[in-house]
From Swiss-Prot:
Protein name listed in UniProt: N-succinylarginine dihydrolase
Reaction equation(s) it catalyzes: N(2)-succinyl-L-arginine + 2 H2O + 2 H(+) = N(2)-succinyl-L-ornithine + 2 NH4(+) + CO2
Catalytic residues (positions): 174, 250, 371 (nucleophile)
Function according to Swiss-Prot or TrEMBL: Catalyzes the hydrolysis of N(2)-succinylarginine into N(2)-succinylornithine, ammonia and CO(2).
Hydrolase in keyword set: yes
Amino acid sequence: MKSYEVNFDGLVGPTHNYGGLSYGNVASQSNSQQASNPREAARQGLAKMKALADMGFKQGVLAPQERPDVAALRRLGFSGSDAEVIQRAAREAMPLLVASCSASSMWVANAATVSPSADTADGRVHFTAANLNCKYHRSIEHPTTSRVLGAMFNDEKYFAHHAALPAVAQFGDEGAANHTRFCRAYGEAGVEFFVYGRSAFDSRYPAPQKYPARQTLEASQAVARLHGLSDDGVVYAQQNPAVIDQGVFHNDVISVGNGEVLFYHEDAFLETDAVLGQLRAKLASKGGNFQAICVPRAAVAVEDAVRSYLFNSQLLSREDGSMLLVVPEECRNNERVWAYLGQLTSQGGPVKEVKVFDLKQSMQNGGGPACLRLRVALKEAELAAVNQGVIMTATLYDTLLQWVDRHYRDRLGEADLADPQLLVECRTALDELTQILKLGSVYPFQRQP
């Protein structure tokens, strides 16, 4: 039976704005309070989805969240009608309103961790929604994320869904942004690679000094247990605390893996040789031939990697076995990074081509191509069991473009978030979207009695 890696990209929501909410994310902080263009952001994301689908890659869509999150504001003590809640929050606590309007769910690499059926004890695809406990604006996402994933992957014969881990710092979980899977073929048993920033319960592990380590070892271990993964198919690695302090807030900002290949920066991990040795040995035991592509700091400094998002790229396998690297425009604009990519594709390794996309609206908030997608490895029968309304086609692309143009503003500043009409616009758009994507009632406003 054939198997595929399907990329489900987050559709940018109507409240996309530059709130500067993500401490430790350099781009998010440096573009704080600029005016955003939600319509352009959504169109840029859709263009990438359509281009990859046209190239023969399996592509799906993950719906955005209801924003502003009025229920979250009510839990913080704001009362009255929905409009009154928004206006009172704007007057009394603007940072809370900004957080409740965040469109950060577009970065679906943080939506969940996914283990394919070939790796799990019960032979089903397992999903654990990420609690995103480190940042308030993201910690409110997982209930809706779970409902959306449940509506997309709704056949219990093939799919198992787990609630987010306990919402405390000790189990801080950032989802697939700190998880990669290596395999010979997508449908065969592989090795799941969990990267953490610190240990919650063992003080012997080093930790960053400036920025928070968002993922704990204990969270990664809990997800592996929930998914029924065997020890011979799991490797844990600690991310280098020094690069977290340089703005590498998730591992997908300093490495990317696919198939048998890990593309990583020289400074990405602690005890790199031991980590690579484990990956090589465990993948070999499953018939695979692990290949590591190390980018030396002499060629690309960590600062350049963070600024260009070289590693927040998509490493995709073509039918002929070669690989394509999907990078943001910022890589072409960085002389050193672009020179390195020229060498990479000409030196005879697995990466044969680099494809550049303009994702500026997302990039200015600190999210590149890899942030925007959740990878799900599926066998043919499993893919057939996915809700087909979320699979990208030419028709769906056209429908979503028209939907965006109807409902999205082309400019959004902080003052606009206080406009109660924005909530009405968002709910109207999402109500229509659930019909387009055949999701049912996944949003809180659709579920109110």
